Amino acid sequence: MRRLPPILAVIAAVLAVAGCGGGGKDSGDGTANVPDKGGLRTKVQAAAAPKASDFPSVDGRSLQEVADSMQGGPEVGLAGQTYITGDNRLAFGVIDSQGKFVYGKTAVYIAPTPDAPAQGPFPAPADVLVTDPAFRSRQAASETDLFAAVYGADVKFSKPGNWTLLTVTQSGGGMLAAPSQVKVVKPSKDDIPQVGEAAPRVETDTIASAKGDEESIDTRIPTAPELHQESFADVVGKKPVALLFATPQLCQSRVCGPVTDIALQMKAKYGDKMTFIHQEVYEDNDPNKGLRKPLQQFNLKSEPWLFVVGADGKVTERLEGSFGLKTFENAVKTAL
């Protein structure tokens, strides 16, 4: 396999995943909605349940040595930009040379440098983005969309600095490896609200504040007025809240539409226990005008972001970039 590069040159197809930026039962993990074309559904179902034992142990090898034992070829597109020392969710897509998403049992290995001892494997289950039909927008992940799921691994970075990653996906009887790199900072250097901290009491856009002009505060097609009934400032600290920052129509990736649809599906199940709020990203829905005030108050520089906040007003989970049905639901449960 090629030498692990210090910076991954990301192809356009990868940007479709990274541009914006778990487990357990839910109202359906979505695999039944994944298209069956070309055996995709079967691949995603297998990819949803990897185990560490499905992958080679590191046995004291460096990350480069692990990579050299596998076949190269695909690229990895990270779905986030924010990583801190300690526990992190690493979300990503794996894309082949034709720009198609690769689905199979997947895991992640990490190390501070390619020549350092590898850590892992950390299983990365595929999390389905395809909602039930009743919750799909025009921007949705659908039964005809081959972008059906996103991978997510729980990893721990022990120190700040650059870290090299190696994603490994089972395909065609072999192992396909794809390298990347992330920058990790101390929590004190991350000014985005973290788990355990009080969420900023921001005024989010509502149907009332928009004087009934739903399209001015929601680029989803059709709009989702259910997610714009209450301002975050009016409910935070009184009951659990799921606050989603996303722009379905203007997102630089293909994930803002699906995550907003997932919010609607979660509201249908948990709306009696939690308030679900969607906040658009850009002033006047124009990227040239900059970010809306709530995003500035949360110190966000990418999107989508999900913040789940408990009844005490403190963040119980935060998710950046792409997240599917299981991950969203598990986040919701942290505040219930």
Tell me the role of every PLM-derived stretch.
Residues 271, 277-303, 308-315, 325, ...:
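Thioredoxin-like thiol-disulfide oxidoreductase module
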Residues 213-218, 224, 232-252:
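Short active-site neighborhood of thiol/selenol oxidoreductases, capturing the structured segment around
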Residues 29-158, 162-214:
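Contiguous segments within soluble domain cores/interaction surfaces
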Residues 188, 193, 208, 212, ...:
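Thiol-/selenol-based redox modules, centered on thioredoxin-like
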Residues 245-248, 279-282, 320-322:
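Active-site-proximal beta-strand/loop segments in catalytic clefts of secreted hydrolases
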Residues 20-32:
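Bacterial lipoprotein signal-peptidase II cleavage site
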Residues 253-270:
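Typically the conserved alpha-helix immediately C-terminal to a functionally engaged Cys/Sec
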